[in-house]
Amino acid sequence: MATETGDDDGGIYFHSTQIQSIHESLEQEKSQRLYLQASIKKLESFKHVSDESLNNLNPSPVSVVQIKKKAATRKRKLSARKPNLKKPKSSSEVVRQAFEKDKFAYFTNNQARIDEFLTNGSVSTENSTSNQGSLISSDEWNYIKQTYLQQQGESKTTLKGIRNKIKQSKNSGIGMWEITASNPDISLNDEDIQYLHDLDEQQMMSDGNSFTDDDIDPTQDDGLVLTLSQNCSSQHDICHHEKDHQEHILINSSIGEAVQHDRNLESRSQKYSDNGNTIPDQNSAIRTGEMESTDAHEVQEIFSTPSYVPSNQLNTDKDSSQESGSSIIMLAENIVSTQPDVIESISDSESEIEIIEKPRLQVLQSVYENDISTNQTRHESAILKYSENSKQSEHQDYESEVVESDSTPIITPNVTPKKKAHISPVNETHGIMNESPVPLASRNTPDRITNIVGRIPSSPSPIKLVLESPLKKQRKIEFSDTESIYSTAVSQFGTPKQTTSSPVEVLTSKVGSPQLGICSDSETISVVSSMAHKKSHAAKKLRTTTLEVSAALRVKTYTDPENNITVKKLGEEKKREFIDLDNEIPDSENSDDDTGFSIIEITRQVVERKEHNNDDYSEEQSTDLFQIGLKDKRDIANTSHLQVPSSLVMQLGNTGNTFLDSSLVEEDDEIAKLTATELRERFKDWGLKPVQGKDKMLEILQGISDFISPESLLALKGDDLQQRVFDKLELLIKQDQFWYDRILTFEPIRLEEMRQWLNSHNHYLELDMLRLYCDRNCITTTNT
């Protein structure tokens, strides 16, 4: 079975390959045929054909394809822009061009656009102030008549009442009746009024102002219906009634009485304000509807806000103060306030401080309106009690402090009257305390100011100041044990300033202790500040000695942090000074080789000793490394000269300081021990150009070491050496104005001239190093 399947598969594969090969051969033949046809067509163009054959043949159209050429790019020339040569148009021409189109075509056969345009025009005319008003239509008059007939009969007035209203409006000069009668050519007769208000015969013949005066309830708020005539002076007075939305004006019948009552209130409030009484300013008042007047539309408030009177005009006398209190109660019955009646008086310290015989007091306290009358008796009792206690305090040598504030008003925190004032744990002077808040600005007469003592509603203060009597003239500070002390403007800690006040002492007492006037035996202690105490350190004293070192000894700048010693080499070489030959140390090797010398400065810290006077200069106090006899005070600033032998070995006596033999000399020894190969490798590492000979390389390194001193030459790696040399060289150039100006002006620098300038300052650098510096900083150089 398997063999049959295998044979079938092999036959299918064979037939498929045959079909594929036949298909490929057919495709190849087809492609060759097409290629031949194309070639023949191309060759037919070269075939010679006679005229007869041309007539018999139908030649195919020949299409000629032209090669597109690129347009030559035109060179754009830069030229000035030509101005606009058009003639400026006048405003009339601009308007004519803007309205060239026919605007009436917009409204043609379109009623909606016409209505929209007319509506917009009517809205814009409503806001105008012209006196020409539109007439009320017949439908609107019918609506007014129907609305009036629907009102109750109680609100209808008689002919006499209407006449009185018209007369009152003419006399007062306000009201809508004057608007209706503003046209002198039109006047209302009895028939017009009867038709307008629909009055019957009984109402026309009645003598009373109202048809039902006795039946009307005074508490009822039924309104009177008033309408406008055809002549309206303002667009706001025009009655625009539509079919679905109609309006009418309801005026309260008690407007006249309310306006009159409001005028009375204003006159009374003006009278009380002139007398110096304060009327509280209400934040919100009752406002009613607005009434329209004749030419100028005026707004009249039914209840106007009383004017505010400053606190400095408060309480001129007792009678006026009582009268003011009654007026405030009367206003409170009529005016409904939406804010709590809390009034805080801000006192002026300059005008309200009263000069009393003994101590003066000023209480910084909030004032509430409801405590003005209740605390008057407490004020007088407090003053009497205070005078008695002040007499007793004279025997104990204590008096209350005079607390004077500056001209800035003191604003107390806003608290409600229901809240009790916070009681401070610190006792006030001589027990003059009131549990309730006390007004500060209350006065009996303008000439006399009553000062009240009360607690300050604020956080308890840890310090209380009390002024003593003139016998002791000392100011004491009382504070509690549980509270810390802080430096204030009155208390003085640290370095006291020169003031006219008495010195400050501190008395310790516990909370709730007896009064300060009774506790006269309190302990006096020093003031302890809450800030960290800064320890005082003894000032360091440094002594500087200047020496002249000559011969072969080379001294470098050196710092010894352990012994606080600094050696500094001063400037360039100086000419030798002529010194006494007796003080000169002879040279052991060559006494003639002493042409060169240098000046060094040695600075050392002075250890102060208490047993000696600082003004005296003794040998024990001297910190000079080279003690060449004692110096007088006049010769301290002079330079002491010391000539040493030309040998490298130097003994400086018994000073015990060997800093001159330290790492500075050891570094030179380490460099000298290096071989030529090692020096050449070091030169390559530092970016320097190696030279022939070990001595020459040592000379170059010695010059660089002196130039970058006190930097260690062996500790520098890579480009650090070049950077140190360049930084030092740049610093020297900036210090010399001549060279700095030449470099800033890009003047070519001669390297040899720069080298000579450095040699004059005892700096020895090679030309290669200077050239590398100039190339690095883009400085132009020349060899000529």
UniProtKB/Swiss-Prot annotation:
Keywords: DNA damage, DNA recombination, DNA repair, Nucleus, Phosphoprotein. One of its GO terms (molecular function) is 5'-flap endonuclease activity. GO terms for biological process: DNA recombination; DNA repair; DNA replication. Residues 405-415 have a biased composition (Polar residues). It is found in: Nucleus. Residues 73-92, 400-421 are annotated as: Disordered. The keyword Disulfide bond does not apply. Pfam families: Slx4. Transmembrane segments: none annotated. Residues 73-89 have a biased composition (Basic residues). The keyword DNA repair applies. One of its GO terms (cellular component) is Slx1-Slx4 complex. Phosphorylated in response to DNA damage. Forms a heterodimer with SLX1. Regulatory subunit of the SLX1-SLX4 structure-specific endonuclease that resolves DNA secondary structures generated during DNA repair and recombination. Has endonuclease activity towards branched DNA substrates, introducing single-strand cuts in duplex DNA close to junctions with ss-DNA. Belongs to the SLX4 family. This is Structure-specific endonuclease subunit SLX4. It comes from Candida dubliniensis (strain CD36 / ATCC MYA-646 / CBS 7987 / NCPF 3949 / NRRL Y-17841). The lineage of its organism: Eukaryota, Fungi, Dikarya, Ascomycota, Saccharomycotina. The gene is SLX4.
